[in-house]
Design a protein with these regions (language model features):
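Immediate post-signal peptide segment of exported/extracytoplasmic ligand-binding proteins
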Residues: 9, 80-88, 231-239
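An extracytoplasmic/periplasmic, membrane-proximal ligand-sensing/linker region
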Residues: 1-2, 174, 178-239
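Short beta-strand-centered segments that line the small-molecule binding cleft or hinge
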Residues: 36-38, 46, 53-68
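Pocket-lining segment of extracytoplasmic ligand-binding domains
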Residues: 77, 87-186
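Short helices/loops that flank or line small-molecule/ion binding pockets
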Residues: 24-38, 51-52, 82, 126-147
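Hydrophobic/proline-rich hinge and linker segments of small-molecule sensing/allosteric domains
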Residues: 58-80, 177-180
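Extracytoplasmic small-molecule ligand-binding "clamshell" domains
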Residues: 1-43
């Protein structure tokens, strides 16, 4: 809500929030011009870009340029992925950049094929569900978005005495704000400028940034998402 009001003020036009059901729905809505601006995970952006050919990523949060995923376990004897050989493991949603795609890609680069390394691979459907599965002993290990992990620990939703991080992925680019390629370029520039102008020293701006878990926004470009596209191709997720 505060972000919508801020954009209305900066752009001098009505801004309407449209909820979407899931990742594929966002891809479809941007491709058919039903959405002008959307907050996308890295993999969803790659799908939108390939489907539309012209979607433009405008800005990302500072941390999205160096995003990571955390590997977690409740087993004190596990200190590496090698220790989970023959045990059970959970990813988040199949099409989640940080909960599935990038961790899988980094595992493959380390010579670990999840389906043969683990006795069973499950998909929890969400980052917090992965943490809950691990904490409840439903799986021996799991992987989730680093910022969600930090939030779960800070809010006490996960017991860090029981569940621990035993590995962190290399960094990659993740979330961004993307506009449809058919949007008026002058308006796209104004939207970008509005995000870049958000200043944490301004209390009103800080409230908007906090809701997005952002320190500030920085510019981004399609080239930044090449690594995710490569990972998606390696995982056979792009047809």
């Amino acid at each position: 809500k505060p972000l919508g009001a801020y954009l209305e003020q900066q752009l001098g036009m009505k801004v309407e929030f449209t909820p979407v059901a899931d990742y594929p729905a966002v891809v479809e809505a941007l491709a058919t011009d039903r959405l002008d601006l959307a907050w996308l995970g890295g993999f969803t952006f790659v799908q939108v870009r390939l489907k539309t050919g012209n979607a433009i990523p405008l800005v990302q949060r500072e941390q999205d340029a160096q995003f990571t995923s955390k590997f977690i376990t409740a087993n004190p004897d596990v200190t590496s992925l090698a220790d989970l050989k023959g045990k059970t493991f959970a990813f988040g949603s199949v099409s989640s950049t940080s909960g599935s795609l990038m961790p899988r890609y980094f595992m493959l680069q380390d010579g670990i094929k999840p389906e043969s390394h683990f006795s069973r691979v499950g998909y929890s459907g969400a980052h917090d569900a992965t943490a809950a599965w691990v904490q409840a002993g439903k799986v021996d290990g799991g992987v989730l978005n680093a910022s969600v992990w930090d939030k779960l620990v800070a809010s006490g939703k996960v017991d860090s005495n029981k569940v621990k991080v035993f590995a962190t992925t290399p960094t990659y680019f993740d979330y961004n704000w993307t506009v449809r390629g058919t949007l008026d370029p002058a308006l796209a520039e104004k939207i970008k400028a509005a995000f870049l102008a958000l200043d944490p020293a301004n209390p009103e701006h800080k409230a908007i940034l906090d809701l997005q878990a952002a320190s500030r926004f920085i510019e981004t470009s399609p080239e930044n998402y090449k690594g995710i596209e490569d990972a998606a191709r390696a995982a056979d997720l792009l047809k």
